[in-house]
Amino acid sequence: MNTLNRCALAALALVGTSAAFAQSSVTLYGRVNTTVEHQKDGDVSKTGLFNNNSRFGFKGQEDLGGGLKAGFQLESGFDSSSGASDSRGIFARQSEVNLSGGFGAVRLGRFTAESYYATADYVSMHNHDTGSSSDAFYAYVMPDANKIAYRTPTFGGLTVDAAVALHEQAVGGKNAYDLAANYNLGALALGAGYSKQGDVNQFAARALYTFGAFTVGGYVQRDEDAFVANGGKRNTFRLAGAYNMGASEFHVNVGRAGEYKNTPDSDATQYTVGYNYNLSKRTKVYGYYTRINNSRAGTYGFNQVPVGAGVDSNTLAVGIRHNF
């Protein structure tokens, strides 16, 4: 029995146990997000159907009394263009168990680094972290697996997350560390994040401001050796803006990756313009154009998949996203 069939059977089993749902407050959720795109890398072009981080998951919480709660979240990625399951594993997007209360929350398992959510995720507003228009330059240092994490209660709008990812005796492996902070002041939201594993590290800071129908934001990041081994340090920034008008959203986004100190001409720029039309709170149709211009030694590509040195890429896409 293949992985996808096992995953489907597990989903059916969970859906069928209505008593367990009632006792554990389990929720089935997900997203199907697919685009038709014309992509071009240098002189090579292709037109096709592309998955954009489609996923489904289960999450639940049990009230243990005295303000203490136990919870879990299991999330699986799949390819919406073909139906194939995530090659990394059934619940490779997220698999965690947690305890929360007045003390904050303790989390164990696999989940996305909070340093990413505190900074880059907020600034990729047009389609968040999905697809070829996603951030090509953000240095994601923290491993997702084998994590122990703690989240503080919120104090005056400030929340802090800290995590360690254990290497579990892997040959040459080192523990990784992640620290993030979010400070919400109504229309103004601030964030910062730091990650480190061995000599590879990154620090980023973000600001997002909403006024009327407009939202503007940006982040700056400094990393060391994240994309290029022994490349040295690199500075990156990204700016984004959005305007909402009824069901329509208009987005513009530009990012700039500086060259690594030990790798001359490794800099690049990414431009994105996008339009979303919200058919409902859960469903939207959208289109975007994004382009990555690499300098002579730059290798940045869509979905952070490297291309040949100096190769420029662009794509024109239309898509449908439905959340459930």
Residue spans of the language-model regions?
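Sec/Tat signal peptide C-region and signal peptidase I cleavage site
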Residues: 18-22
